[in-house]
Design a protein with these regions (language model features):
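Substrate-binding pocket helix/loop in short-chain dehydrogenase/reductase
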Residues: 72-73, 80-83
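Residue(s) in the substrate-gating loop at a strand-loop-helix junction
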Residues: 114
């Protein structure tokens, strides 16, 4: 955790209060646990009030909350698709824009997207689209904030061993079956913090295979990339061709 720098206090925002309390013993700073559902507009107003009352000097904002469901478009409830957009896109933008007035030169902003941000991904269509938004938003914001001396970077991991991954597969119904490699979350974050503090990159990508895949999908037609993905998932025909 020393790589994070030195802070007077760490604000940790999530829905589950028990997880927030457990985090207190894992970091070397005083922790303020804040239980909020960021898809609730009222929660964002509460966050705005917290900022206005505390008027903190924010040294680092890490937007890493996310929600995903994998599967055919007709297998994922509309409410879940809209929740992905609300949390992965709308809440991230709100947290960023509410916090930026409290960030000075030298502050850092980290947004979590995904390898799926670089290509269209059948059976992850809404999730991957939200991550493409995060990547584009983060890179353009990085350029805008450069004159202010605020460092902005996206983190684009491949498959990662997390509780999120397990939940995302619950609706998959075998639509997504092939994962070439699962990375440890701590290794992804270690690379991200190195890149954030020691490089000028606007995108951090952990793992040589993931970096090569990003390069490859930039060169190949997206139609071919999607066809390869479908074959990897053992879907040689589209659903309406069955």
């Amino acid at each position: 955790m020393a790589q994070w720098g030195t802070f007077d206090e760490l604000w940790v925002i999530a829905r589950r209060a028990d997880r927030l309390e457990a985090l207190k013993e894992q970091v070397p700073f005083p922790v303020r646990p804040i239980s909020l559902d960021l898809t609730d507009p009222q929660a964002l107003e509460l966050y705005r009030d917290l900022l206005e009352n505390a008027r903190p000097d924010v040294g680092l904002l890490a937007n890493v909350a996310g929600f995903g469901k994998f599967g055919r478009y007709d297998q994922i409830p509309l409410a879940d698709s809209l929740k992905m957009i609300d949390l992965n896109c709308k809440a991230l933008v709100a947290m960023t824009e509410l916090t930026l007035p409290y960030m000075k030169r030298g502050a850092k902003l980290l947004n979590l997207d995904s390898l799926s941000a670089f290509q269209p991904v059948p059976y992850l269509n809404v999730y991957a689209s939200t991550k493409a938004f995060v990547l584009s938003y983060t890179r353009s914001l990085a350029r805008e904030l450069r004159p202010r001396g605020i460092r902005v970077m996206a983190v684009s991991p491949g498959w990662v061993k997390t509780e999120f991954f397990d939940h995302a597969l619950q609706t998959s119904n075998d639509a997504v079956t092939y994962y070439n490699r699962l990375y440890e979350a701590k290794d992804v974050m270690k690379t991200a913090l190195h890149d954030l503090y020691r490089t000028k990159k606007d995108v951090s990508i952990h793992g040589l295979p993931v970096r090569w895949q990003v390069r490859l999908v930039k060169l190949l037609p997206h139609k071919l990339v999607m066809d390869i993905w479908m074959r990897q998932q053992k879907h040689n025909k589209l659903p309406d061709e069955d």
